[in-house]
A protein has these predicted regions:
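Intrinsically disordered, low-complexity regions enriched in Pro/Ser/Thr/Gly and acidic residues
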Residues: 1-110
C-alpha cells in the first residue's frame, strides 16, 4: 500500500493497493466510492506505470493485456464517471485471463 499524488491536481491523491486477492479486488472494484471526482479510479493488472492521466480521468496502464473502458488507442482502465464497475468488467480485471498477474487497485481522493 502506498500513496501517489496526482501530477495534474495537487489537491488529489491516490491510494494504491498491490497484491490483492481476486475476491478482494472484486469487492473493492464493485463498491461505489463516491462521485466522479472522488473514489475508485481503476483496477491495475500486471506491471503498470501507475501514471494518472487526469485529462481523461483514467488510470493509464502500460502493456497490451487488454482494455476495460476508455479509448481503444491506449491501455486505459476504468474511468471514474462510470462507477462502480460492472461485475463483468471486474471479473475480467480481477480474474481471468489475468490471473498470472498481480492485481493492483487505485482509489482517488480529492480534497
Amino acid at each position: 500500500v502506498y500513496i501517489e499524488y496526482d501530477p495534474y491536481n495537487p489537491k488529489s491523491f491516490y491510494i494504491i493497493l498491490d497484491g490483492l486477492s481476486k475476491e478482494a479486488c472484486m469487492t473493492l472494484a464493485t463498491t461505489n466510492w463516491g462521485s466522479s471526482s472522488t473514489g475508485l479510479v481503476g483496477v491495475l493488472v500486471g506491471e503498470t506505470s501507475r501514471f494518472m492521466d487526469d485529462s481523461y480521468n483514467y488510470l493509464v496502464k502500460n502493456g497490451t493485456e487488454g482494455i476495460i473502458g476508455g479509448a481503444s488507442h491506449k491501455g486505459y482502465y476504468a474511468n471514474a464517471p462510470y462507477l462502480p464497475l460492472s461485475p463483468a468488467k471486474v471479473l475480467d480485471a480481477c480474474g481471468e485471463p489475468y490471473n498470472s498477474y498481480v492485481p493492483g487497485f487505485s482509489i482517488k481522493f480529492t480534497k
